[in-house]
Amino acid sequence: MNFKPLGQRVLVERLEEDTKTASGIIIPDNAKEKPLMGTVKALSEEVAKEGLLKAGSQVVFAKYSGTDVKLEGKEYLILKVEDLLGTIE
């Protein structure tokens, strides 16, 4: 993929959510909540210079943030850095 975010933005791929409950009930796609965690796939030059994030970082983000995009058949989220709540190590 050759996508480069602009400004203070990052491209994030959401982490997959379980499709089954612990008791084995299958959850349909329309009943699942989208996960609020993901992996940074690309970041702007501005964000890279700050050194706080890098490609591969796992992040937590605000519920109603970002713009959904589809690139090369995969779904991603373009987020402003200010919408990121933290990283997972």
UniProtKB/Swiss-Prot annotation:
Belongs to the GroES chaperonin family. This is Co-chaperonin GroES. Together with the chaperonin GroEL, plays an essential role in assisting protein folding. The GroEL-GroES system forms a nano-cage that allows encapsulation of the non-native substrate proteins and provides a physical environment optimized to promote and accelerate protein folding. GroES binds to the apical surface of the GroEL ring, thereby capping the opening of the GroEL channel. Coiled coil: none annotated. It comes from the Bacteria. One of its GO terms (biological process) is chaperone cofactor-dependent protein refolding. It comes from Wolinella succinogenes (strain ATCC 29543 / DSM 1740 / CCUG 13145 / JCM 31913 / LMG 7466 / NCTC 11488 / FDC 602W). Heptamer of 7 subunits arranged in a ring. Interacts with the chaperonin GroEL. Transmembrane segments: none annotated. GO terms for molecular function: ATP binding; metal ion binding; protein folding chaperone; protein-folding chaperone binding; unfolded protein binding. Keywords: Chaperone, Cytoplasm. Its main location: cytoplasm. GO terms for cellular component: cytoplasm. HAMAP family: CH10. InterPro entries: Chaperonin_GroES (IPR020818), Chaperonin_GroES_sf (IPR037124), GroES-like_sf (IPR011032). It is found in: Cytoplasm.
